[in-house]
């Protein structure tokens, strides 16, 4: 019980800090503008762009937090399980993310080794994989690549998201699925990272009784490996 209370206090403290940071930045920028009698148009536009970015960041943090809270309260009987063509879903995800990849000069590749149909919550699975691919794009390098691979056997389907990005230090790997953890806070701020995307992805995958692993080499890239059962069986019905 003490550990739970401590964990809750740490989470609330982190939430408070993360929500205050963009507001503090907006306040500083606004105060700076108001203290100037004659603001050059270019400087005004620059400050307003920064304020807009901070508002977007605050909004993203709130949306991610609401999603996590909703998932924490979601029981298995509230999962909208249906048969989904995973190949088609991955194609849609990459199609939506191509404009972001193009801006970062990152190539997106989908390799479907076989056709896969599985029992999943379509919306939640799409969210999890989108977070993984979007991270791979954001933390990549110029002229980099993200390869998404889909395979399956008789029991599970497997998704790998591999990038040629900046990589993750070994001592950070065990923490990357923690809420609000960011390897490079400066880079996360630059690309709009909230430190919640991977926590959401892991939560979704675990709700499907799956697992997610990560391998990374600094300066070479990162690979996230996901394994999810083809047939969803509620835990109360699963055999011990």
Language-model segments: residues:
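Short alpha-helical segment of the dimerization/phosphotransfer core of two-component systems
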Residues: 53-61
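Conserved micro-motifs of the catalytic ATP-binding
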Residues: 73-79, 117-120
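Conserved catalytic submotifs in the C-terminal HATPase_c
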Residues: 80-83, 102, 107-117
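Short helix-loop "hinge" at the ATP-lid/N-box region of the Bergerat-fold HATPase_c
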Residues: 136-137
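Short beta-strand/loop element within the Bergerat-fold HATPase_c
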Residues: 143-155
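Short conserved segment of the HATPase_c
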Residues: 168-182
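Conserved glycine-rich
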Residues: 209-210
């Amino acid at each position: 019980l003490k550990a739970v209370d401590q964990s809750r206090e740490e989470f609330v403290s982190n939430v408070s800090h993360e929500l205050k940071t963009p507001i503090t930045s907006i306040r500083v920028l606004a105060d700076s503008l108001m203290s100037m009698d004659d603001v050059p148009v270019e400087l005004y536009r620059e400050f307003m762009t920064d304020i807009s970015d901070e508002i977007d960041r605050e909004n993203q943090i709130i949306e991610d937090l609401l999603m996590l809270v909703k998932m924490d309260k979601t029981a298995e009987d509230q999962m909208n399980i249906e048969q989904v063509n995973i190949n088609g879903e991955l194609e849609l995800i990459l199609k939506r993310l191509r404009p972001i990849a193009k801006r970062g000069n990152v190539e997106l590749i989908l390799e479907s080794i076989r056709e896969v149909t599985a029992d999943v919550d379509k919306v939640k699975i799409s969210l999890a994989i989108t977070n993984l691919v979007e991270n791979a794009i954001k933390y990549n390098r110029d002229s980099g690549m993200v390869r998404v691979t889909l395979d399956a056997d008789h029991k599970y389907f497997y998704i790998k998201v591999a990038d040629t990005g900046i990589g993750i230090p070994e001592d950070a790997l065990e923490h990357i699925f923690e809420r609000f953890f960011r390897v490079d806070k400066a880079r996360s701020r630059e690309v709009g990272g909230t430190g919640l995307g991977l926590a959401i992805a892991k939560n979704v995958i675990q709700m499907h009784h799956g697992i997610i692993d990560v391998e990374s080499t600094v300066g070479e890239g990162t690979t996230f490996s996901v394994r999810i059962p083809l047939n969803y069986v509620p835990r109360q019905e699963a055999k011990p």
